[in-house]
Amino acid sequence: MTRLRQDSGGQGATNGGNGNGGKGSSPAIKLEGVSKAFNDKKVLDDITLEVAEGTGFCLLGRSGTGKSVTLKHIMGLLRPDSGKVFVHGKDVTALSGLELAEVRRSMGFLFQNSALFDSISVGENVAFPMRRHTDWPDAKIREAAKGKLAEVGLDKDYDKMPGDLSGGMRKRAGLARAMALDPDILLVDEPSAGLDPITSDEIDQLLVDLKKKGTTIVAVTHNIPSARHIGDQLAMLHEGHLIAQGTAEEFDKSDDELVRAFMRSESSG
């Protein structure tokens, strides 16, 4: 298994069967020695990892171990106390506001609660990023939004309100909105949260399908079956430290009892 400070995110190209991991000469995402503290409590302690382009990367760990904080650093919502964060080779910790906005346009975000606007239709939720970031005419935006909804099986739900959707349908709609601008990277926070096992599997498969098309997926999850399904590489955080990184098979065979115990659990939240 790959251990702390041994960068091997690119190994994901040899695992998971999608064959996309080697298409880029540099990693899609790279963290170098990232540390972060809140009120003198260190949440991330010298985190170094890489995510190969076109692969699935799952961050594992119990609640409060720094997984979502790591995701926020990649998004540029937080700046590390020390260390650097690179997205497509650009150090997001050193970018201006305009430069960071440009990098963010290459990323999509699927939040745990789907984060849909309840006051507008499902279709207009998906269309929102297009209206904000393109100069497309209304007809093209509507057509594109319908296409994104069709990709997640919601082609008949454009005019429905978010409150009319089930939890799984809301998650699908959130995914359609996250992919509205065809981002290279998709960041996902707890894709299985609040979903039954069948719906969770369906969401996982949608993420795998996106990965097969070349999208880099970074998912924070407690759900071990989801991590096995999505992740070419897994990384486990514990008390702010990166204690393991490797494939699911390597995690299963780890000599670290904490890692093996986590992998044996169906859900560790």
Label every model-predicted segment.
Residues 180-184:
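A short, proline-enriched helix->beta-strand linker immediately N-terminal to the Walker B motif
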